[in-house]
Amino acid sequence: MRRITKGSTGALDNTPAMPHIVPHPYHGSPPEWQALRVSATLKIMEPEVSLSCEGIERFLGEEDSRVHALRGVSLQLERGTVHAVVGPSGCGKSTLLYILGLLDHADSGWVTIENEAVSHLVDDALARKRNELLGFIFQFHFLLEDFTAQENVMIPMRRLGALSESEMHARAAQLLEAVGLGNKLKRPSRHLSGGEQQRVAVARALANNPSVILADEPTGNLDSKNSRRAFELLQRIVQEERKALLLVTHNPEIAEACDWIHEMQDGLIVGSHPRGFR
């Protein structure tokens, strides 16, 4: 764009016109505004952490034969992510899982779930937080064989005591439908296949809508086909419902499909790798 004006001689002035610059809304603004903007940007970029632990130490056994099972373990799980803990037998994987699940206590360090420090709660308060915030899946599903699939899923709801009888029935039916067992909710667990029983265990882990799911070899008793199906079911639930899943596994195929792999050795996490970078 050129500015066209008449000078005293009547000639046209072809000097390029200066463009009109609209100032950026933060340009020249007070430092506190700029700090607020940076803070808001960083907050958007930060992942939402569902569970974290810091400096977890655990000793097992009597004084004369104590084992240093965990040596300052730190970890964090973000919403919508699946984490695997791998390592040789006896390296501390299950001990860590039980401490994070508030089923055992650490000798030092802390655990935070949904921004609340929970590791130093006692008895009733600890049990309530465990039932509210955590879901568990074990290698052996521990279903009550004479209970129906629906009744097994309702067990954690009864323990928490937040729903009426009709609400518990409806919730259990909804969860069993989600894991593909809507047509078998009245079937006793002993009449279900191994893969179906594990799916009931997944539904039971979700009974109280936990923020975090902890799983100890959740597919260990299944054949490769059902193992993959069970893992893909968990993976889908975690992603769709923005939960966090930490599983202990010896299955390299399952581990490699997780978002993060944490390698343990002698009570330490010696390496953490995102998927595809191990």
Residue ranges and their predicted role:
Residues P188-Q198:
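Conserved ABC ATPase signature
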Residues F147-P156:
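Short coil-to-helix segment of the ABC ATPase nucleotide-binding domain corresponding to the Q-loop/switch region
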Residues N209:
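Conserved catalytic motifs of ABC-family nucleotide-binding domains
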Residues I213-D216:
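Catalytic Walker B motif of ABC-type/P-loop ATPase nucleotide-binding domains
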Residues V86-P88:
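The feature captures the beta-strand-to-loop junction immediately N-terminal to the Walker
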